[in-house]
Regions:
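Class I SAM-dependent methyltransferase Rossmann-like catalytic core
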Residues: 1-37
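Conserved class I S-adenosyl-L-methionine
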Residues: 36-48
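Conserved SAM-binding loop of SAM-dependent methyltransferases across substrates and taxa
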Residues: 49-63
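Conserved SAM/SAH-binding beta-strand->alpha-helix loop
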Residues: 74-76
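S-adenosyl-L-methionine
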Residues: 79-108
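A short SAM/SAH-binding and catalytic strip from SAM-dependent methyltransferases
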Residues: 111-127
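Conserved beta-strand signature within the Rossmann-like core of class I S-adenosyl-L-methionine
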Residues: 139-151
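SAM/dcSAM-binding transferase cores
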Residues: 173-218
Length: 218
């Protein structure tokens, strides 16, 4: 069992992971609700087993409007996501691939919603900044990016929020979940998106012992 499969198996009622999931899904619902009528495209980077998006779509009024691309490197998690997606919507594609580079998104962008959850706590501060600066290349105009990062010391979330502003995003929502070290944010693109280029490196996961998430939530 990989470390990422073990991490996903850590969800339990009332746990910090579950409360994070609830916050992410609330922001996904809000983003879907805010979009005009018509097709909706969603990208989930480092999608894991896909529960962030796949747990929202059933029963949501925009369910049939959504096409999704879930990118996950771990083959076991990608297969879990694929099996889950098959029972949710035929318009969800799961790719076993490297979400840290832009190549897997070729042919799918621009997206109306981009999920960058479980990433910022596992990469260097410089790579967080680089990712935020380049996320608009995956985005349609006025797209929403939903992201997570632990609020453990030293808390980088205020800086990340400022980086989103610098990158042309307005903050829609941010919550530091009480009694946890979990932060979840949503930002809407308010400036023209960057041009998409394939094979651009966004980030690199650090070795396990060097990851900021070792100090708390991801």
């Amino acid at each position: 069992m990989s470390e990422w499969v073990a991490w996903h198996d850590g969800y339990a009622p009332g746990s910090a992971l579950t409360r994070r999931l609830e916050a992410v899904q609330r922001m996904i619902r809000a983003a879907l609700d805010a979009l005009p009528q018509g097709p909706i495209s969603v990208i989930s980077m480092c999608a894991g087993d896909g529960r962030d998006l796949l747990g929202v779509l059933p029963g949501h009024p925009r369910h049939n409007d959504v096409r999704g691309l879930l990118v996950e490197l771990d083959p076991d998690l990608a297969q879990r996501a694929r099996e889950h997606a098959a029972g949710v919507s035929p318009s969800i594609e799961v790719v076993t691939g490297d979400a840290s580079r832009t190549t897997p998104y070729t042919g799918f962008v621009p997206a109306d919603i981009v999920l960058a959850c479980g990433i910022f706590g596992n990469i260097s501060d410089d790579d967080v900044h680089n990712t935020v600066a380049n996320l608009s290349a995956l985005c349609a105009p006025e797209a929403t990016v939903i992201w997570t990062r632990g609020t453990f010391a030293p808390d980088l979330t205020p800086t990340i929020r400022a980086w989103f502003t610098e990158a042309g995003f307005a903050e829609v929502d941010f919550v530091a979940i009480p009694d946890t070290t979990v932060g979840v944010g949503a930002n809407r693109l308010t400036t023209p998106p960057r041009s998409f280029e394939p094979d651009v490196r966004l980030f690199t996961f650090l070795p396990s012992e060097e990851r900021p998430s070792r100090r708390g939530g991801r």
